[in-house]
Amino acid sequence: MSNTTVTQKRRTLKVAKSSKTLNVSSGVFRPNQSTTKSINPLFSGKSFGSTGDSKVVDKISAQTPKHTAMVVDENGQDVTPHPLYNPDPGVLQSKQGKVFTALDTSLTTMTEFPSIAFQTTNASLTGPFTRSFFGSASASRISQTAESVTDETKDLLVKQDLSNSISDIQSHREEPKEQLRENILDSTANCYLSETETIWLLDIPAVSVSVESEDAEAVKERNNAYTELCKNRQGNDKYVERSMQTFSDASKTKEVQCDSITMVDKAVMCTVWDMYDSFNNISDVSANTVVSSERHEATIPESSSEGHLVHPKRSNQSLSVVSTVSTVSGSSTHIEKMACVLPLDEEPDLQLILQSDKLKQDLALMERVVLANVFQPKLAAYRQLPIIEDPDCVQMVMEEESWTEQSKNSHCPFLERLWDFSCELTMGRNVSCMVWNKKNPDLLAVGYGQVEFKNPNSGLVCCWSLKNPTWPDRVFHCESGVTALDFSASNANQLAVGMYDGTIAIYNVQTSEQTPITDSSDCANLHTSPVWQLTWIDHEDGLAADKGEILVSVSSDGRISKWIHYKSMECVDLMKLKIHDLQWKRHISSLTPGMCFDFHPNDSKIYLVGTEEGHIHKCSSSYNEQYLESYKAHKRPVYKVTWSPFCSDVFLSCSSDWTIQLWRQDLQIPVMGFTSGQRVVFDIMWSPHCATVFGAVSEGKVEIWDLRVSSLDPTLVNWTSPGVNPTALLFSPETDCVLVGDSEGQVTVYKLKNITAGGGSQGETLEDVIQSTLSSQH
């Protein structure tokens, strides 16, 4: 919108008749072409028929007057309204023919007639959109043709006016757009913007003005005058009180529906300890506040009736005097003053209560009591205790009874799932290692890392308790992925943690401090590759300073080291794993990476170590130059090697070559070989209760082997969920349960069913199986 000044002037409209023709130059046609239009008066409002031929105009001109309705104002200016609809000249047909016959069906309105009738071609026709509308020949032809129109034709045209006027308007065609050229696109288009006047949509006058405004003084004067007027109104004869009658609207009764009012009885229970604590508080207050004036003149001033009494032992507690009683004895003038005081009620600080250690301990104890009730059937099955039936849980009992009946009828070994250790912190993490506390068998430490350690920058250690399977008691965040764990036997609160970056740290599980007691970061001879296993060993040889429990580790840097920590950790190499295979000597390093090790159960100097080249070496801590024995059967890295707890000459090994080997230390070749599929075996472990039973985990399944039953197939196989791989296995030291950690961060507890140890000595049973196997080989 542009800022324009509009002059409102009352115009006088006049209607004048004129037969003048109006020459209009249309922009649709070529330059130097004009159109001659004759505007006829619209006095009858009738409709006339029209075909596509231009000669229809000649017939109509003879019947209608040749006068044009013109509107002029008082100044003589032409203000005649233009027609609302201007048809496109391209719509008209170029064919010449007879028009206005009796069978014409195409109609048009009178308002459209001037525009259509006078768009006739002149004597010269050069092509589409090149007609000339000038000349008198066109006007004379219109006059001669229009006179031949009969009255019947006019009546027919009037009757069809209404139905065809709308269709004629809808026949408007969009004007052709001008074709864009490069010179037009490159030209500069000027756009002019102008500011419009302010449009007020809402204007609320203010009831206050600024002190700095010009009207501030006037407003103050009016306010002061009004204040004085209000003061002088009382008692002034100029003001008379009058009573006015007002109309009270008729009241209407309405009903409202609401909820029914229910009465509830409430009761408060007063327990024995509440009464005991209340009675003790009253007794303490009475004993401390009833004092004698002779014995406590220094502590009770004379003005105590108006002030407060403060007990020496409770100087931080404000007391108020509620009564003072004076008694006079008849036989003496001894006056005793007794004052009864009560402590003032002070609101406790809720924030301090919530942050107190006492509240945390109480909540932890309460949580364990509640979870003991919830997990009672599962914990009882784990500890091999009788299950207490819950009368309110009939459905669960029926399901357990049906499951028990099926298991009794089948007599087949199977794994019964009890529960799993998992929380939000462990979801999506890989369980890399697990270990029991040597003094507290209910405490389990689990190490977490990333799958295949693609992201070694996030490690986690959780200490789980059987008393709370839903949340760990201790959580330690590590800078790198956790690869190895072990509890100390002499100091059960110390947990050694090996990490993927080669760091070894020792944490105190008695506290929740995230800072370790000590670590190997300051040691000059620390590991430079992942630490795959840690073990605390009682070392009795050497000097007095070297005796005691030491920590032994194996790493991918090819070293087996022992760690002694007093103020800091010191490292000494027990063995450097030299490359034994000629194929591995092509590598730059002369040491082969160590993957696992295990010390002999009866001789702490002897230990086995598994390497990445697939060999198992028997070593001694007293001699670090050469291997005592080497066992070569695996073709890929050895992930686990473990001595039998019942037979000290037998050990197991597993590898990524899909096999499990049973060895006897006096033989260079394995006694037995086990495989159940083309899958990598991640972990193995002997059962602590049966000499012939061991467990193994591979990709997608858990296997339990019993050598008494079969040495070809596992006794039972438990398949995991699709996409979940078990990564670690651990037997319970006191019950027939096995724990399985997987790649999703869950540690599932299973109970072994229908697997019992045979009669006689466990070691002899395993020896008999080995001897029978060796006899069959010869």
Curated annotation (Swiss-Prot):
Xref: InterPro entries: Dynein_IC (IPR050687), WD40/YVTN_repeat-like_dom_sf (IPR015943), WD40_repeat_dom_sf (IPR036322), WD40_rpt (IPR001680)
A single GO molecular function term of this UniProt record: dynein light chain binding
The UniProt record lists the keyword RNA-binding: no
Localization per Swiss-Prot or TrEMBL: Cytoplasm, Cytoskeleton, Flagellum axoneme; Cytoplasm, Cytoskeleton, Cilium axoneme; Dynein axonemal particle
Record keywords, A-Z: Cell projection, Cilium, Cytoplasm, Cytoskeleton, Flagellum, Repeat, WD repeat
WD repeat ranges per the UniProt record: 477-517, 526-573, 586-629, 633-673, 676-715, 721-760
GO terms under cellular component: axonemal dynein complex; axoneme; dynein axonemal particle; motile cilium
Main location: cytoplasm
Self-association state and partner proteins as the record states: Part of the multisubunit axonemal dynein complex formed at least of two heavy chains and a number of intermediate and light chains.
Name of this chain's protein: Dynein axonemal intermediate chain 4
Recorded phenotype for the gene knockout or disruption: Morpholino knockdown results in ciliopathy-related phenotypes, such as curved bodies, hydrocephalus, abnormal otolith, randomized left-right asymmetry, and pronephric cysts, accompanied with paralyzed pronephric cilia.
Pfam families for the chain: WD40 (PF00400)
Function: Plays a critical role in the assembly of axonemal dynein complex. Plays a key role in ciliary motility.
